[in-house]
Every structure is written in structure tokens, then in C-alpha cells.
Design a protein with these regions (language model features):
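Alpha/beta-hydrolase active-site loop
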Residues: 177-180, 187, 204-223
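Glycine-rich nucleophile elbow surrounding the catalytic serine of serine-hydrolase chemistry
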Residues: 236-249
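Short alpha-helix in the alpha/beta-hydrolase fold that links the catalytic acid
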Residues: 482, 496-506
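Catalytic histidine-centered segment of alpha/beta-hydrolase-like enzymes
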Residues: 523-535
Length: 554
């Protein structure tokens, strides 16, 4: 799940625990040997490197009326940041002629133990392999694991707060084990993953070091489990979608690993398009345009529109045309827009959002996500959901200009965290003595600067919004057979569905490669799978995508 910048994501996080293993030792006191005796020297703290783990178990899941036996492996693989070499440099080696003073830099000391749960179908021939991860940044992958495709699924309320424990774990009839073997990965420092060593946050908390760690993990996994010749897929949700764009490009460019497909759920590749506080970037009006269809879908769902629209998809097509037509021209005019045209656009925005014309004019025709969520049902002191705008909850502060929390995250978080802890410890037999961290506070310290493909070693200025569209485009050009599937919910105000369409239509790729991209939309939110009927549709679409692109004739 969890979207970048979500306060509610952090609300379900446990307090951070120490993730480094230290051993403090001292030599025993030296015997008094007279005047020549030297005082003992303290060795200080010594970092004990992580060791890989693997705990195997067996289970069965029924999908489509067929029982599938599987082996589950819960464990960790050890990854290192860029620049690390498995052959340590000899400190006594003299630098080569012309080398920098002091020779080559020493190996980075930071490392990560990345936690994963892998599911392998028992028996049968070669199988596709899909790597799953959520986003954040700073989120573990319990959301996709327990809510979408793992063999066990947590039961939650569809559009209301799930009652407190006990929670129900059931057979997941929408598990993707019928189409692919699966690997669910926790990002460094999240879930049961741990980081340690000097500058560990710098080594793993950023667009590029995070992607490098995932690419390293995937390479190690393919070796450990002998899966180099398997059809390979990435499945990322939310921040996991920009991660996928960078990872697929790194795998193909730096490691010569071609993938069969990339599956994106709730996509954001260009952060300049985020509907959260676009007022901080005046002159860039696209976020207001690409979020407008989601505002319309939300107002339609809550019956806030002045007119009836019996077919949601037909209505949204109309709104999309307005957003990229008359609305785009009005915003581009800026202060040159006439009063007559301004009033006409405000009236049309009222028709599509349900917000009062006076409010829209006061907002200069530009309404950001937090303000929309606070005001759509504000007359009843109700806050509208961010991750899933079908959800509602009482205002924390009825006088606030913007929404203070996300009712959907508050409604589901406890069920998911409790279910995964129960499942991991009792059924996967992993985690004794370890704290599970569903999310960690990395967003404000995350390094969003990014080195673009083909730009040498110079990183993108951190003052620019992160944009990884060139990475996905580069991967598609390097591997013209790479297929991409975009999945999105109509009621997602964190990563609006039309934003994903806009990004894909503007990838810098030849027109012929646009045919490698397919789109699937759902009457659901950011966590499409939180609605059981949408989960079934998502399963069917993804399974079909894998079967069509795996080159196995399945």
C-alpha cells in the first residue's frame, strides 16, 4: 500500500527499534607487571555482519476451484550499497599509477538484511516469478501480501472502519499462485528487514540506493533459487511504481537481466503531478487537470453532483476531455483569463466536483487534494478518504483548511498489521524475538534526487521533482519486448488514475512501443484489492497478463 507522504501510514507504524547488531567487548584487566605494563585498550563496538536466513513451510491454497500445494520460504538475503565489492581491497596495496591519492576507496560498511516471503508451487514445470513490493517510501509489503495475492487474505470491511480484533484470515481465492511463483520483499529497514553499518540511512534511503538494493536482491534471489531462466516480473504499488521504473532499467542496463513485464498498481512516475499541495509549485497546473476525473468520481460516489450520471465511465470520459481542453486552456491563461471565462470554468468545475462556485473562484480554479477532501462533505463535518475516497470519517478539526488524516488507512491498518504478525509467526514460523515494522519514518529524509539514464554520474537537481519516466522509457527501448500493465482505481486521490494515463502517454518512447502498454481500471481506490470484487478483477487481469507474456505457451 502505503502512499508517499501519508500521515496515516505512519500512524500504524511501531516505534523504531534498533536494527544494528553490536557486540561490546573489553579485554580482561591486564595483570600488574610493574612499571612497564601498558593499560588495556578498549576495542569498542564491533559490527557483526548480518547472516542470511531461510525458514521453510508448506501449505495449500484453492484458486479457481483447484487446490495448489506450495512451499513457503521466509528469510533474508544480504545486500550492500553501490560501490561494494565482494573482494575487499588490500589496505597494503599500493595505488596504481594515476590513481587518486590513497588508492581506491574502501568498501562501504553499510549492509541490509532484506526480508522476503517466497511461494513456490509444488511440482510442475518451469514457472514465471514475480517480485512484489509496496511503497511509502518506508512501507513494508504486508499490504500486497495479506490483502491481494498471498495464499492467506485478511478480511476487512469494504468501505467502513474494520472492527477491532479478532480478525479473520481466510483462503485467498485470488492468490496469484495459479499464474506465477511469488516473492514479497520488505524494503531495507521496513518490516523484518534491517539495515546496519556506517551511514546506513544514506546507503539505502533514496530513489537510487533503494532501487540498487532491490536490483541486488533480485540478482541474489535468482542465483540462490536457480531461477535465472524463469520469466520475470516486477509488481510495485504506489511508491513501488517509481521503484519498478528504476529497478527494471538498472536490471537491464547494468546487469543484463531482461524482464518479461512490469505491473504497476496506483502509479506515480513524475512527482510534479502529485495532487498533494501543488500550490507549492505555482505555474505547474497539470496536477489540477489530472486529478479532476478522480474528484468527479468521488463526488459521483457521494452523490454530491448537481446532476445524475448513471454510467461512471462515460461521465469520466467527459471530465477527462474537459480537463485537457477548456480547463487546461483556462489555467494556462493565468491572470489573463477574463472574468466571464473564469465564471464559466468555475460553474463547470462545480458540475464535476460538487464544490460551491464561490469556493472554486476563491481557490483560483485550483483545488488541491487535501482541500477537496476537507470540503466535499464538510457541511457534515466529514473528511473524505485519500487512499480510497469512498471512505469517510469524522473531521479531526472541522475548521481546518485541509484534511488532517485518511479515513481509509485508519480503517484498515490495524487488521493488516495484526494479521501479518499472526501469520508470519504462527504459519511461516518466522520472527521470534523480532519486531515487525509496518512503516518507518523515511519520507522527510528520503533522498529524492535521481541520476537519469544516459546522464553520466551527475544527479538530477534535488530542487526538481523526481521523475523516473525516462527510466521506464529507457528500459522499454533497451528491451522492445518488455510489456507494461497499469492498474488503477477510480477513487484513488493519492495517485489519481488519469495521472497514470498521462504519464504513459508522455513516455519518451517510439509510438510503436505504446502498444506494449495496457490499462486496467477499477471502481476501487489506491488499494484496489481492498474491495473483494475488484481484487477478483485484478487477479484475473494480472494472471492473464503474465500468461500472455511469459513465453511459456501457458
Amino acid at each position: 500500500m502505503i502512499p508517499f507522504g501519508s500521515k496515516s501510514c505512519l500512524a500504524v507504524a511501531f516505534a523504531l527499534a534498533s536494527c544494528t547488531l553490536w557486540a561490546a567487548t573489553r579485554e580482561p584487566p591486564a595483570q600488574d607487571k610493574g612499571p612497564e605494563a601498558e593499560p588495556p585498550k578498549a576495542e569498542g563496538h564491533k559490527f557483526e555482519p548480518f547472516k542470511p536466513e531461510a525458514v521453510a513451510s508448506n501449505g495449500s491454497v484453492t484458486v479457481g476451484g483447484h487446490a495448489i500445494s506450495y512451499q513457503a520460504i521466509a528469510g533474508t538475503l544480504i545486500v550492500h550499497p553501490k560501490g561494494w565489492d565482494d573482494v575487499p581491497r588490500d589496505p597494503n596495496e599500493k595505488p596504481a599509477p594515476g590513481a587518486p591519492e590513497g588508492g581506491e576507496p574502501p568498501n562501504p560498511t553499510a549492509e541490509a538484511a532484506m526480508f522476503y516471503v517466497a511461494y513456490f508451487k509444488s511440482g510442475g514445470g518451469p514457472r514465471p516469478l514475480t517480485f512484489f513490493y509496496n511503497g511509502g517510501p518506508g512501507s513494508a509489503t504486508l499490504w500486497l501480501h495479506m490483502g491481494a495475492f498471498g495464499p492467506r487474505r485478511i478480511v476487512t470491511s469494504t468501505e467502513a472502519h474494520t472492527p477491532a480484533a479478532p480478525y479473520a484470515l481466510v483462503n485467498n481465492a485470488s492468490s496469484l499462485l495459479d499464474a506465477t511463483d511469488m516473492v514479497f520483499i520488505d524494503a531495507p529497514g521496513t518490516g523484518f528487514s534491517r539495515i546496519a553499518g556506517k551511514d546506513k540511512e544514506k546507503a539505502f534511503f533514496g530513489v537510487d540506493p533503494d532501487a540498487y538494493a532491490f536490483a541486488e536482491f533480485i540478482s541474489e534471489f535468482l542465483t540462490k533459487y536457480g531461477r535465472w531462466n524463469s520469466p520475470k516480473y516486477l509488481f510495485g504499488e504506489s511508491y513501488g511504481t517509481p521503484r519498478s521504473a528504476v529497478v527494471v532499467n538498472q536490471l537491464e542496463s547494468d546487469r543484463s537481466i531482461d524482464l518479461n513485464g512490469v505491473i504497476l498498481l496506483s502509479q506515480i512516475l513524475s512527482f510534479d503531478l502529485s495532487p498533494d499541495r501543488p500550490t507549492g509549485n505555482p505555474g505547474v497546473d497539470l496536477p489540477y487537470q489530472t486529478v479532476l476525473p478522480t474528484y468527479a468520481a468521488t463526488a459521483w460516489y457521494h452523490h454530491k453532483l448537481p446532476a445524475e450520471h448513471p454510467n461512471l465511465e462515460t461521465f469520466l470520459t467527459e471530465v477527462e476531455q474537459f480537463a485537457m481542453g477548456d480547463y487546461a486552456r483556462a489555467l494556462a491563461a493565468g491572470s489573463d483569463l477574463s472574468a466571464t471565462d473564469r465564471n464559466a470554468i468555475a460553474a463547470k468545475l462545480h458540475d464535476y466536483t460538487g464544490l460551491p462556485v464561490e469556493y472554486i473562484l476563491k481557490a483560483d480554479l485550483r483545488i488541491d487534494g487535501g482541500e477537496f477532501r476537507q470540503n466535499l462533505q464538510g457541511d457534515g463535518n466529514i473528511t473524505t478518504g485519500r487512499l480510497d475516497s469512498r471512505f469517510s470519517g469524522p473531521d479531526l478539526d472541522p475548521l481546518s483548511q485541509r484534511a488532517d488524516y485518511d479515513p481509509q488507512s485508519s480503517a484498515l491498518g490495524s487488521a493488516y498489521v495484526s494479521a501479518f504478525n499472526e501469520y508470519a509467526r504462527k504459519e511461516l514460523h518466522y520472527g521470534e524475538g523480532k519486531m515487525f515494522k509496518p512503516s518507518i519514518r523515511t519520507f522527510r529524509t528520503w533522498n529524492f534526487s535521481h541520476q537519469l539514464p544516459g546522464q553520466g554520474e551527475g544527479p538530477l537537481s534535488p530542487r526538481q521533482g523526481t521523475n523516473v519516466m525516462p527510466d521506464l522509457a529507457n528500459a522499454m527501448k533497451l528491451n522492445p519486448n518488455l510489456k507494461v500493465q497499469l492498474n488503477a482505481g477510480y477513487f484513488d486521490l493519492a495517485t489519481p488514475f488519469y495521472q497514470g494515463i498521462y504519464e504513459m502517454r508522455h513516455l519518451p518512447i517510439p509510438q510503436s512501443l505504446q502498444g506494449n502498454i495496457e490499462y486496467r481500471f477499477y471502481q476501487s481506490g489506491h488499494m484496489v484489492y481492498a474491495k473483494e470484487s475488484s481484487l477478483k478483477q485484478l487477479h484475473d487481469n494480472v494472471a492473464d497478463f503474465i500468461r500472455r507474456t511469459s513465453n511459456t505457451g501457458g
